[in-house]
Regions:
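A late C-terminal transmembrane helix in Major Facilitator Superfamily
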Residues: 351-383
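Helix-loop-helix hairpin linking two adjacent transmembrane segments in secondary transporters
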Residues: 154-203
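Flexible cytoplasmic inter-helical loops of multi-pass small-molecule transporters
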Residues: 199-222
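Cytoplasmic helix-loop-helix junction between adjacent transmembrane helices
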Residues: 119-158
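Cytoplasmic membrane-interface "Motif A"-like loop-to-helix N-cap segments
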Residues: 86-96, 291-304
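Conserved MFS/SLC helix-loop-helix module at the cytosolic interface between two early adjacent transmembrane helices
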Residues: 75-113
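Intracellular juxtamembrane helix-capping segments at the cytosolic ends
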Residues: 129-142, 335-349
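Extracytoplasmic gate region of multi-pass secondary transporters
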Residues: 44-45, 231-273, 278-283
Length: 411
């Protein structure tokens, strides 16, 4: 008597390995953001000077290449979400890392604008499937109480990659490896290697405790109709179109802009790295703040205001004020995305079951913003070098309006 474990004891013992394992899953998820998405993406802006000289590209063509990578995200964002909902994130992410890594390496074989644009589109087609399934993974492994933190860690992984990609790709990796082409080859091979831990990973458990959307998704048409009927998802899509487009355009243009006004190349790259480093530093604190605040929407609106302020200041800032503007805008980027993903999963009628498709739909809007914002903004540089930042800040204002209209929606 007293020696036989109770059911509660058995549950505690059996659940402990799963509790520990979810942190391993989260570490792989964050590393996937770093090595398979962020570094291969953010290396391009700092390599553009070298690429443009090698391929004889103009400023507008550079903006087109930077923006066109978002084109497939308009479509594959939704497709990738549906695939993740139906096949599971484990298999989806294993395949996506393998294929995105190969496509990223192919960019290094480009010989002109057409081939560069084609390979950039192919990379975007496959890499855009990764973030939504990473955040869906967080939704299936973590409870609502821990979801903000989990998404914050995943977002910090993205920010770490953005920081490293912008900091070392042009000043360290390119000279060391012998040029921009070899940099892309190495980054592609690294992303491909991440396919293995996802392939070997345990299947995700059932719903980790999030309310709403507990039922499995039905037929594809029914799933899409269900998501399309949630008005708040469309408003969040409108919001991310403006805010993501603002950030995408600004990050691609910033190193070129600073070089153009006389900054040394290393300092221009450091400004972009600072944006990403500040974002990485505050990703988890901002996610935790939203948990304590009790209103994701309020946190998102505060973040949008900071992006608007920072990007707007870049249009007129000079000298030390550039660093201030970069810090203000960069403070919230990845924390904003962590809260945004959590907001989608927590929206009434979504939950983890529909999370992939819902995130995919909103990321389609993000891809549209990322596609149109860079070339449109860059084309305004002929009026004055700072005018593109004014345009992109205006896009973020449009996104802020979408957040204002997307009232809180609790299950």
């Amino acid at each position: 008597m007293g020696l036989n474990p109770t059911r509660s004891d058995e549950h505690m013992v059996s659940s402990q390995p799963e509790t520990n394992y979810r942190w391993y899953v989260l570490s792989v998820a964050a590393l996937t953001h770093t090595l398979a998405v962020a570094i291969p993406s953010m290396c391009l802006p700092v390599l553009f000077t070298e690429i443009a000289g090698d391929l004889n590209l103009s400023l507008v063509q550079i903006g087109l290449v930077w923006g066109i990578g978002a084109l497939p995200g308009v479509i594959t964002g939704l497709v990738g979400g549906v695939i993740g909902d139906r096949l599971g994130t484990k298999r989806t992410l294993s395949a996506a890392c393998l294929l995105a890594g190969a496509a990223g390496a192919l960019r290094g074989t480009s010989g002109d604008l057409v081939t560069l644009g084609t390979t950039v589109v192919l990379f975007g087609l496959l890499a855009s499937m990764i973030p939504m399934n990473v955040h869906k993974t967080c939704g299936t492994w973590f409870s609502q109480r821990q979801l903000g933190l989990a998404n914050g860690v995943a977002a910090m992984g993205m920010a770490l990659g953005f920081t490293l990609g912008s900091m070392v790709s042009a000043t360290l990796m390119s000279p060391w490896l012998g040029g921009w082409r070899h940099v892309l080859f190495v980054y592609g091979a690294t992303a491909m290697a991440l396919s293995l831990p996802w392939y070997l990973m345990r299947p995700a458990p059932g719903d980790a405790g999030l309310p709403a959307g507990a039922a499995s998704p039905g037929p594809l048409r029914q799933t899409l109709a269900h998501i399309a009927g949630v008005r708040r998802i469309w408003l969040l899509g409108w919001a991310i179109l403006g805010i993501s487009g603002c950030i995408q355009g600004s990050l691609g243009y910033l190193p070129l802009y600073l070089r153009g006004i006389g900054w040394p190349g290393a300092s221009a790259d450091a400004a972009l790295a600072t944006f990403n480093a500040v974002s990485m530093t505050f990703a988890i604190p901002m996610a935790l703040w939203s948990d304590r605040l009790g209103s994701r929407r309020t946190a998102l609106m505060a973040g949008a205001l900071m992006v608007i302020t920072g990007v707007g200041l870049l249009s007129i800032a000079g000298g030390a004020m550039v660093w201030v503007a970069v810090g203000i805008a960069g403070l919230v980027r990845d924390g904003f995305m962590a809260i945004f993903m959590t907001t989608i999963i927590e929206t009434k009628g979504i939950g983890p079951s529909y999370a992939g498709t819902a995130i995919g739909l909103t990321m389609g809007f993000s891809g549209l913003g990322n596609l149109i914002a860079p070339p449109l903004g860059n084309s305004l540089a002929g009026l004055a070098p700072g005018i593109p930042f004014v345009f992109w800040a205006g896009l973020a204002v449009m996104g802020l309006l979408g957040l204002y209209l997307a009232k809180e929606s609790h299950p």
